[in-house]
């Protein structure tokens, strides 16, 4: 599902109350955006840091005016049922698809997840959606959107 990310020397773990993810803006610059909502937070955003691809397609995020974005990382971490950590490197040009949600002018980013491939399903049944910049239609997901 993606419980943490790393970009250069920076590691970000979802449980941290100030966790932010690096989102590529249209101009190519990186903006760090608050990652989802923690259980203890009081706000209107959905709890958690992940958005199932199926729920996006079903329209469950529509009220938050969602925008697809590129989460730029070098690697991400997943835990298995026993809590063992596994780090997975992204290849050059790959990114994690994110969903930028807006409520009352505030933005939060959620990692888009889908069913895991058979070779990784034993670690976790859901997996971040990894896309290749060259394969993405720039008008749809492409160069992302500004978080502000």
Predicted features along the sequence, with ranges:
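Short linear sequence motif anchored by a di-proline
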Residues: 1-148
């Amino acid at each position: 599902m993606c419980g943490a990310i790393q970009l250069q020397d920076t590691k970000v773990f979802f449980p941290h109350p100030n966790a932010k993810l690096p989102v590529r803006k249209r101009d190519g610059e990186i903006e760090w955006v608050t990652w989802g909502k923690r259980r203890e937070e009081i706000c209107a955003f959905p709890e958690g840091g992940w958005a199932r691809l199926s729920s996006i397609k079903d329209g469950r995020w529509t009220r938050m005016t969602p925008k697809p974005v590129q989460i730029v990382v070098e690697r991400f971490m997943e835990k298995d049922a026993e809590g063992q950590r596994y780090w997975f490197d992204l290849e050059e040009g790959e990114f994690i698809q994110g969903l930028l949600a807006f409520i009352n002018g505030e933005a939060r980013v959620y990692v888009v997840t889908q069913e895991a491939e058979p070779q990784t399903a034993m670690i976790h049944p859901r997996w971040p959606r990894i896309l290749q910049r060259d394969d993405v239609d720039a008008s749809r997901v492409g160069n992302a959107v500004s978080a502000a």
